Design a protein with these regions (language model features):
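Catalytic binding pocket for nucleotide-activated donors in carbohydrate/polymer assembly enzymes
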Residues: 1-127
Length: 127
Protein backbone atom coordinates (compact mmCIF):
# COMPACT_ATOMS: atom_id res chain seq x y z
CA UNK A 1 0.00 0.00 0.00
CA UNK A 2 1.29 3.44 -0.92
CA UNK A 3 2.08 6.00 1.78
CA UNK A 4 -0.91 8.14 2.69
CA UNK A 5 -0.88 11.91 2.83
CA UNK A 6 -3.42 14.70 2.64
CA UNK A 7 -3.67 16.59 -0.63
CA UNK A 8 -5.36 19.87 -1.54
CA UNK A 9 -6.24 21.93 -4.62
CA UNK A 10 -4.84 20.65 -7.90
CA UNK A 11 -3.15 17.74 -6.11
CA UNK A 12 -6.55 16.64 -4.76
CA UNK A 13 -8.01 16.65 -8.28
CA UNK A 14 -5.00 14.76 -9.66
CA UNK A 15 -5.27 12.18 -6.88
CA UNK A 16 -8.97 11.57 -7.59
CA UNK A 17 -8.44 11.42 -11.35
CA UNK A 18 -5.60 8.94 -10.91
CA UNK A 19 -7.45 6.64 -8.50
CA UNK A 20 -9.34 3.49 -9.44
CA UNK A 21 -11.71 4.01 -6.52
CA UNK A 22 -12.02 6.66 -3.82
CA UNK A 23 -13.38 6.20 -0.32
CA UNK A 24 -15.70 8.65 1.36
CA UNK A 25 -16.20 8.67 5.11
CA UNK A 26 -18.86 10.71 6.85
CA UNK A 27 -18.22 12.98 9.80
CA UNK A 28 -19.85 11.53 12.90
CA UNK A 29 -19.39 14.85 14.68
CA UNK A 30 -21.36 16.72 11.99
CA UNK A 31 -23.79 13.82 11.51
CA UNK A 32 -23.11 13.90 7.76
CA UNK A 33 -25.42 11.93 5.50
CA UNK A 34 -23.40 12.96 2.45
CA UNK A 35 -20.59 15.41 1.67
CA UNK A 36 -19.36 17.34 -1.36
CA UNK A 37 -16.87 14.50 -1.91
CA UNK A 38 -19.86 12.33 -2.81
CA UNK A 39 -20.17 14.45 -5.96
CA UNK A 40 -16.49 15.32 -6.53
CA UNK A 41 -15.39 11.70 -6.69
CA UNK A 42 -17.75 10.50 -9.44
CA UNK A 43 -17.31 13.82 -11.26
CA UNK A 44 -13.71 12.72 -11.92
CA UNK A 45 -14.83 9.36 -13.38
CA UNK A 46 -13.63 7.59 -10.25
CA UNK A 47 -15.78 5.04 -8.41
CA UNK A 48 -17.29 6.42 -5.20
CA UNK A 49 -17.25 3.94 -2.32
CA UNK A 50 -18.85 5.49 0.72
CA UNK A 51 -20.28 4.71 4.09
CA UNK A 52 -23.96 3.97 3.67
CA UNK A 53 -26.62 6.58 4.37
CA UNK A 54 -30.26 6.62 3.30
CA UNK A 55 -29.81 10.01 1.63
CA UNK A 56 -26.71 9.02 -0.30
CA UNK A 57 -28.21 5.73 -1.42
CA UNK A 58 -31.15 7.70 -2.83
CA UNK A 59 -28.74 9.71 -5.02
CA UNK A 60 -26.89 6.75 -6.59
CA UNK A 61 -27.85 3.20 -7.51
CA UNK A 62 -25.62 0.92 -5.44
CA UNK A 63 -23.35 -1.28 -7.51
CA UNK A 64 -24.33 0.61 -10.67
CA UNK A 65 -23.33 4.28 -10.10
CA UNK A 66 -21.46 4.06 -6.77
CA UNK A 67 -21.15 1.65 -3.86
CA UNK A 68 -21.80 1.75 -0.13
CA UNK A 69 -20.61 -0.20 2.86
CA UNK A 70 -22.04 -0.72 6.34
CA UNK A 71 -19.17 -2.67 7.89
CA UNK A 72 -15.45 -3.31 7.50
CA UNK A 73 -16.26 -6.67 5.93
CA UNK A 74 -18.55 -4.98 3.37
CA UNK A 75 -15.80 -2.50 2.50
CA UNK A 76 -13.16 -5.19 1.99
CA UNK A 77 -15.48 -7.25 -0.21
CA UNK A 78 -16.47 -4.20 -2.28
CA UNK A 79 -12.84 -3.10 -2.72
CA UNK A 80 -11.82 -6.55 -3.96
CA UNK A 81 -14.62 -6.53 -6.53
CA UNK A 82 -13.58 -3.14 -7.95
CA UNK A 83 -9.85 -3.81 -7.93
CA UNK A 84 -10.27 -7.24 -9.52
CA UNK A 85 -12.81 -6.36 -12.24
CA UNK A 86 -11.66 -3.47 -14.42
CA UNK A 87 -14.66 -3.58 -16.78
CA UNK A 88 -17.10 -3.43 -13.87
CA UNK A 89 -15.13 -0.63 -12.22
CA UNK A 90 -15.08 1.42 -15.43
CA UNK A 91 -18.81 0.86 -15.96
CA UNK A 92 -19.66 2.09 -12.44
CA UNK A 93 -17.30 5.06 -12.77
CA UNK A 94 -18.91 6.10 -16.06
CA UNK A 95 -22.45 5.68 -14.70
CA UNK A 96 -21.58 7.63 -11.54
CA UNK A 97 -20.19 10.49 -13.61
CA UNK A 98 -23.33 10.52 -15.74
CA UNK A 99 -25.53 10.63 -12.61
CA UNK A 100 -23.65 13.68 -11.27
CA UNK A 101 -24.13 15.55 -14.55
CA UNK A 102 -27.73 14.48 -15.24
CA UNK A 103 -28.84 15.37 -11.70
CA UNK A 104 -27.10 18.75 -11.86
CA UNK A 105 -24.46 18.17 -9.19
CA UNK A 106 -21.65 19.46 -11.41
CA UNK A 107 -20.12 22.91 -10.88
CA UNK A 108 -21.73 24.51 -13.94
CA UNK A 109 -25.23 23.36 -12.96
CA UNK A 110 -24.75 24.47 -9.36
CA UNK A 111 -23.56 27.89 -10.49
CA UNK A 112 -26.59 28.26 -12.77
CA UNK A 113 -28.82 27.44 -9.80
CA UNK A 114 -27.10 30.04 -7.58
CA UNK A 115 -27.43 32.69 -10.30
CA UNK A 116 -31.12 31.85 -10.73
CA UNK A 117 -31.66 32.27 -6.97
CA UNK A 118 -29.77 35.56 -7.07
CA UNK A 119 -31.90 36.84 -9.96
CA UNK A 120 -35.12 35.79 -8.21
CA UNK A 121 -34.13 37.71 -5.08
CA UNK A 122 -32.95 40.69 -7.11
CA UNK A 123 -36.20 40.79 -9.10
CA UNK A 124 -38.29 40.59 -5.91
CA UNK A 125 -36.38 43.52 -4.45
CA UNK A 126 -36.99 45.60 -7.60
CA UNK A 127 -40.77 45.18 -7.41
Amino acid sequence: MAPLQQVWGDDYNKALCGAKVALCFMSKLNKDTYTRRCFEIPATNTVLISEYSDELSSLYNAGVEADFFKSKQDLIQILHRYVDDEAYRESVAKAGHKRVVVDGHDVVSRMKMVLEWFNEIKNKDLK
